């Protein structure tokens, strides 16, 4: 079992943790989150980005992690970036707790997400279904109020 965690911080009140667990290289990965400080009753995009570099804030993380050269999509789509996690929903206080299982995100192997950045976005991810070219790259999810590098957890 490999476990990892990203501690989310940024230039906003958004903060939290996202944890990852993968039993072995052939297993799906469980992604769990506890994120606070978002807008109430909203859907916010979150993605794994290419780089674990936050020297200039969350913008240094680069584009979505996309080792297979696909277009942006929903987590359940066959064609999507490895880093496409979709949206999480917030409650009346702007908080969100949840988990999902993902078949593309890996902690073990050549396409591991360890050392990359988990970014929470300021807008809703359109899951690549928008009319613009940007939809196929980013899901039009907007600014990056919080992020954290994915590191090995105890």
Curated annotation (Swiss-Prot):
GO biological process terms held by the UniProt record: cell redox homeostasis; cellular response to iron ion starvation; cellular response to oxidative stress; copper ion transport; fungal-type cell wall organization; intracellular copper ion homeostasis; intracellular zinc ion homeostasis; negative regulation of cellular respiration
The protein's Enzyme Commission number: 1.15.1.1
Cysteines paired by S-S bonds: 58-147
Domain of life assignment: Eukaryota
Chain positions recorded as Zn(2+) binding sites: 64, 72, 81, 84
Annotated GO MF terms: copper ion binding; oxidoreductase activity, acting on a sulfur group of donors, oxygen as acceptor; superoxide dismutase activity
Cofactor annotation remark: Binds 1 copper ion per subunit. Binds 1 zinc ion per subunit.
Pfam families assigned to the protein according to its UniProt record, in alphabetical order: Sod_Cu (PF00080)
Cofactor: Cu cation; Zn(2+)
Catalytic reaction(s) noted: 2 superoxide + 2 H(+) = H2O2 + O2
Region (Disordered): 124-144
Compartments in which it is found: Cytoplasm
UniProt protein name: Superoxide dismutase [Cu-Zn]
Organism: Emericella nidulans (strain FGSC A4 / ATCC 38163 / CBS 112.46 / NRRL 194 / M139)
């Amino acid at each position: 079992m490999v476990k990892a965690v990203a501690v989310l911080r940024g230039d906003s009140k958004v903060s939290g943790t996202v944890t990852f667990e993968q039993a072995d290289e052939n297993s799906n990965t469980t992604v769990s989150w506890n994120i606070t400080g978002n807008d109430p009753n909203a859907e916010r995009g979150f993605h794994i980005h290419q780089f674990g570099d936050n020297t200039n804030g969350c913008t240094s993380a680069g584009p979505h992690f996309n080792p297979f050269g696909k277009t942006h999509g929903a987590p359940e789509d066959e064609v999507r970036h490895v880093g496409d996690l979709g949206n999480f929903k917030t409650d009346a206080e702007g908080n969100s707790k949840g988990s999902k299982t993902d078949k593309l995100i890996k902690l073990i192997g050549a396409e591991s997400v360890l050392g990359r950045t988990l970014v929470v976005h300021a807008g809703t991810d359109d899951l690549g279904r928008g009319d613009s070219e940007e939809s196929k790259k980013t899901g039009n999810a907007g600014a990056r109020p919080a992020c954290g590098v994915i590191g090995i957890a105890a």
